[in-house]
Amino acid sequence: MEKLHIRNISKLYGSIKAVDNLSLDLHEGELLAILGPSGCGKSTLLGCIAGIETPEKGEITLGGRCLFSAEKGIQVPPEHRKIGFVFQNYALWPHMTVNENVAYPLKMAKVPSKERLEIVEHNLNLVELCAKGHRYPHELSGGEQQRVALSRALVMNPDLLLLDEPLSNLDARLRETMQLEIRKIQQKLNLSVIHVTHDQAEAMAMADRIAVMYQGSVIQKGTPHEIYENPKTQFVASFVGTNTILTGTRTHGGEHIRIAGAARLRIPVALPSYKERENQPLLVAVRPEDVALYAMNEGPVRDLPTAVVSNKVYKGAHILYEIICDQVIIRVQAHPTDRFAVGERVYFHPTKSVVIDENGNAPLM
């Protein structure tokens, strides 16, 4: 069941289209991640949904209730939309205790004092902060402040929760912990959530679906697996993961792509829907984990192309190499026990790839 409908929303700042004729749906109980680079319109879109930005055109409905319609002249105020919002900087009142911060929306709604206390206690228990209700924001860690902001956003039992990069100010370990905590709470309460982030790992870890935004538009939607395995455009292929994007042409028979600038390099690929595209240019995305490296003294790989290791970065769980084959640079992710030196010549074997055509469309493979 669809919870939120966004139809043809546009938001302008002068001549700049921050959101450009965007349409999007959110399902009941779903966590949808809006993933994109800085300046692509992610936060502006949240502002339009929450009512703190006014679009120039389009329509937004939540649970069957129209929140905004340019055509009908409808603009429901933010406080009447039943939407919770967690901002990037948390926006906690520094002169209020945790209890007072969480209770503030209830106080504004004139909820009786006794009922307020019960609701605040329940919501702080939800984020495991009930024992710190008497503290002030500056007495809390970043993760605790984030949980207070989340508790406050949930205190009015919203129909929709919006998260605007709330984890970006946390250190890496705490960020991973909070990803799990937010997801656990979302699933426990069956919340409908839109989570904005520029962090692809965060989107992959938390979301049921991902919508990739670029220049004010959603250019691809799908599950994390679909987005990662089948990018539809060169931008998605380069933004999600660390793909190497190569240009090539389909060889006779269609089982390989001949890469421009590397005479011996053939990338294996299945192209059943591109039989008519022989000798026409195609873009190929190759993920680092889909390339194997072999030492030159390994006999069974003599027929493979060779390259020179130009760079290596130790990542702990793996080593990220850059290798050069003729004029082509390819990234390779290898096990830390597979050690190759910069300047060493190696065999390499791309095991699979994703093909993106000139129009930005990619076949499902």
Can you describe what each PLM-predicted range is?
Residues 50:
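Helix-to-loop junction immediately C-terminal to a conserved catalytic motif
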Residues 58-70:
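Conserved ABC transporter NBD signature motif
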Residues 256, 261-311, 338-365:
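Glycine/charge-rich catalytic "coupling/switch" loops of P-loop NTPases
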Residues 81-84, 88, 92-235:
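ABC ATPase nucleotide-binding domains
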Residues 35-37:
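The feature captures the beta-strand-to-loop junction immediately N-terminal to the Walker
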